[in-house]
Amino acid sequence: MEKDLKFTTSHEWVRDNGDGTVTVGISDHAQGLLGDVVFVDLPEVDDEVTTGEGFSLVESVKAASDIYSPVTGVIVEINEELEDSPELVNEEPYESGWIARIKLSDSSELESLIPSDTYLESLDEE
């Protein structure tokens, strides 16, 4: 796992793209709990999202799980590959399984996210 990723307590990950946008997906831990992903309800480009509010839905053979926005901003890109290949969320959660790119309203929000090493330690305690 990349050291530059940050996480939320609800198991979303965030990659700072360095241009005022972030890429968002769900963690390897989350996809493992869900099991085989069969559908991803993607947000729309230009949708406004707010920290902590649901903006996507991932359905698996076991359950449907809301995906919560880790930051406030505007959706600038969605991963359209997931429409035909939702299994990418399972196979490559940190690479081709990303869900959306968000233009940040306030980059300081990134400071409140959980660093990757702290996130991994919290999983070991579960």
Curated annotation (Swiss-Prot):
Give the matching Pfam families.
GCV_H (PF01597)
Identify its protein family: Belongs to the GcvH family.
Q: Which GO terms describe its biological process?
A: glycine decarboxylation via glycine cleavage system
- Supply the InterPro entries for this chain: 2-oxoA_DH_lipoyl-BS, Biotin_lipoyl, GCV_H, GCV_H/Fam206, GCV_H_sub, Single_hybrid_motif
Self-association and partners:
The glycine cleavage system is composed of four proteins: P, T, L and H.
Which residues, renumbered to this chain, carry the PTM N6-lipoyllysine?
K62
Domain Lipoyl-binding per the UniProt entry, residue ranges? 21-103
Record text on cofactor binding: Binds 1 lipoyl cofactor covalently.
* Keyword field contains Membrane: no
NCBIfam families linked: gcvH, PRK01202.1
**Per its database record, what is this protein's job?**
The glycine cleavage system catalyzes the degradation of glycine. The H protein shuttles the methylamine group of glycine from the P protein to the T protein.
Against HAMAP family, the record matches this protein to:
GcvH
Asked whether the keyword Lyase is assigned, the reply is: no
Q: Which UniProt keywords apply?
A: Lipoyl
Q: Which organism is it from?
A: Aliivibrio fischeri (strain ATCC 700601 / ES114)
Q: Output this protein's name.
A: Glycine cleavage system H protein
Per its Swiss-Prot or TrEMBL entry, what cofactor is needed?
(R)-lipoate
A single GO cellular-component term from the record reads: cytosol
